Structure formats: structure tokens, C-alpha cells
Amino acid sequence: MDNTDRRRRRKQHKIALHDSEEVSSIEWEFINMTEQEEDLIFRMYRLVGDRWDLIAGRVPGRQPEEIERYWIMRNSEGFADKRRQLHSSSHKHTKPHRPRFSIYPS
């Protein structure tokens, strides 16, 4: 094996590693925010739009990228199914809702 083959393989390996480091938005984990954080983000968004750095400056401990990702996941139609799955799985451990009275005669 000559040097050009080794260099070519090394370069291909580096390209493959770089490609695998990228994370698709489909693989994002949901970001949990407190009600206060959600309220602040919504109010700030109405004031300044998608200036995530300004919004993050008002939400302690949150990065602009994190807030933008939260906003996309919360408001995008593409994540509607994931939101429903997350919502339904969080309510599986609660008691099922039963009406106080039956609409059917006993």
C-alpha cells in the first residue's frame, strides 16, 4: 500500500467522523422548561422575535441554542407527533378519567 492510498483512507475516515458528529433535529431530546421559563420565553418572543440571545439573557442558565431548539420543538408541526407521544406517555401512570355518573342506565 503506497502513501496516496493511506492518505485517501485517512481523509475518508475523517469525513465519516465529521458526518457522524452532526445531530439531526429528529434525534433532539425534548427540553423541559418550567412554567415561568415558558411564560417568559413566549412574552420575550412577542417583544423581540427570534433574537434567541436576548431571550436567553433573561432566562437564567439557558443558552440561546437551547431556547431556539425548545421554541422549534414546541411550535413546529414536524414535532407534533413527538409532543403527543411525550404527553401521552407522561399520563400513563395517572388514573384514567372516569365520569361521576354513567350515561347508561344500570
Swiss-Prot record:
Q: What induces it?
A: Negative autoregulation. Repressed by CPC.
Cellular compartments annotated? Nucleus
Do you know which InterPro entries this protein is assigned to? Homeodomain-like_sf (IPR009057), Myb_TF_plants (IPR015495), SANT/Myb (IPR001005)
Per the record, its GO cellular-component terms are: nucleus
**Region (Disordered) residue spans:** 83-106
**Primary place of residence?**
nucleus
- The reply on keyword DNA-binding is yes
Task: Provide any one GO MF term from the record.
Answer: transcription cis-regulatory region binding
Task: Describe its function.
Answer: Transcription factor. Involved in epidermal cell fate specification. Negative regulator of trichome development, including endoreplication, by lateral inhibition involving intercellular interactions. Promotes the formation of hair developing cells (trichoblasts) in H position in root epidermis, probably by inhibiting non-hair cell (atrichoblasts) formation.
Q: What PANTHER family does UniProt report for this protein, alphabetically?
A: TRANSCRIPTION FACTOR MYB51-LIKE ISOFORM X1 (PTHR47998), TRANSCRIPTION FACTOR TRY (PTHR47998:SF88)
Its recorded name reads Transcription factor TRY
What gene does the UniProt entry assign to this protein? TRY
